[in-house]
Amino acid sequence: MLNYKKIEITVKSKKQFVKAEYSAVEQNKERQMFNADWSKKSDQPINRDLSNAWDRLIPMLMYGTTLVDHTINLDESMDYDKYFREFEYNNDERFDGVNVTKAVFGGNNNVESVKLYGYKLIEEFGKPFKVKFETPVIALDRHAENKFPLVVNLEEMCNDVQVLTKEWMAGATLSKAEVAALKEKEAGEPVEA
């Protein structure tokens, strides 16, 4: 049985690649059980649906930090639907020049947190500069009311990453309907394809 440890999405040449780390209970020739830690890295970009979902979540993650601009903070009275689902954040110049190069999802058999790494392009004396940043570890706490829309979307995407990664590690290529069926099986409840 595979136990999820960490999923890392790295951006190279505007494409996202996945690296997954798992632990598993293995059996040696003498039939003794032991814990084995191992990882697998893809050499193919992640699929389009997952890539699009990840791109849409970046502003939500950045909005949950104070690194891009000190005025970016979670606000309980915020209209999340309007700001994120209607892509109003595209007009927010505080996100201009923000590039996330890596997202690391951590946990203990479940996705519990995420941390972002990247840079913001700024111009000084007529020349562009990359100012590197990394966010704090962002806990995926479904019960924090002011973070609920953010967390629900993150968890949904992380579940997709886990399902796709497990099957990819087994050498399978899945359709969207097959991914939905696997998610339904793991969650024990129907999931729309």
Please provide the spans of the model-predicted regions:
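Conserved binding-pocket/active-site segment within a compact domain
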Residues: R94-E186
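OB-fold ssDNA-binding interfaces and closely related basic DNA-contact patches used
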Residues: M1-V111
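Secondary-structure junction/capping motif
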Residues: N52, S175, E192-A193
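Polybasic, proline/glycine-rich intrinsically disordered low-complexity segments
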Residues: K185-A193
